[in-house]
């Protein structure tokens, strides 16, 4: 008996009236993960499209692969030189299970480490965070699905991977579990679940950690996976001394724009490489999963605001001098613009609203980065702020359209 036949034989017990009917969401999630659902349309429909929600989420997940793999490589690429500068590898192996595992696997952690060793070390930091986040999120999704009696939505795959990509590699696992719990329950499930959340769950979870546990999510010691090493992000360096202050934390060499574009600098695991993000972004824009109007609006808002600050200038705030092309490649701007701001649930759905929504994100991101002295990164808060205004933009656009059509009809 094949596996599919086994599922079909078990299915009646999970259907309404069956012995395990309350557990149908769990059965359905496993079955549809392995096989295409047999449900088909029997009547006329307005839209016929092979891209259902499952395939859409899988496409977004796959589009993140360039950022995932480069992020893992960069964790090792930043950590290994720092380790050799500190010279405390034996102490780390004794006190940090990440390096104990790396040592047991025979990874080369010397200055001559290969890209494979760097990638493997990065995976040792990234995969546990992702597995914890995925497991906790799955438990909550299954629990709410069983209680409410609806199917498990595949959006959890995207929420979990995005959350894992926007946190530091050194984040404690229990905080990762707590952050995604907040994002799933408070930002999504209490408002009705999938399709009803007005904020991005991954960003809401990270914002919770930022305000609740700032020492583990920000500062100078969390971005390089080497205990005892302190290295500020490029945004922090610029905020202290302008472009001339940008330098690699280990070698002291200047950070070029190409270094930032490719991602050769410390930061959150999925945010460092603008190049990798744009490769994945091209996929979701081409497949029309991401709205290009939102991305264009973010760029327009960012360019206009940064140019305005450049013209105003400041003798005391170096961030006024940051041009738009540096804003584009530093911090979480690219990842937020391409994969976070374009979330179809929490973003505006009208075409005109998408322009205003995107522009607000671009303006607020630069405004927070430039004017706020306590927090050099502004993309996370800018997107969450714009999420609150997305329904307002749509309401204004819809009402304006109603008035226009009414005037045309009456005229």
Curated annotation (Swiss-Prot):
* Coiled-coil residues: none
What's the catalysed reaction?
Answer: a ubiquinone + n Na(+)(in) + NADH + H(+) = a ubiquinol + n Na(+)(out) + NAD(+)
The UniProt entry lists membrane topology as: Multi-pass membrane protein
Provide the protein's localization. Answer: Cell inner membrane
- Per the record, residues carrying FMN phosphoryl threonine are 233
**Which parts pass through the membrane?**
56-76, 120-140, 166-186, 272-292, 294-314, 319-339, 348-368, 378-398
Q: Which domain of life is it from?
A: Bacteria
Q: Which UniProt keywords apply?
A: Cell inner membrane, Cell membrane, Flavoprotein, FMN, Ion transport, Membrane, NAD, Phosphoprotein, Sodium, Sodium transport, Translocase, Transmembrane, Transmembrane helix, Transport, Ubiquinone
Q: Which HAMAP family match?
A: NqrB
Q: What is this protein called?
A: Na(+)-translocating NADH-quinone reductase subunit B
Gene Ontology MF term list:
FMN binding; oxidoreductase activity, acting on NAD(P)H, quinone or similar compound as acceptor
Q: Does the keyword Lipid metabolism apply?
A: no
Signal peptide region: none
Cofactor(s) it depends on: FMN
Which organism is the protein's source?
A: Haemophilus influenzae (strain ATCC 51907 / DSM 11121 / KW20 / Rd)
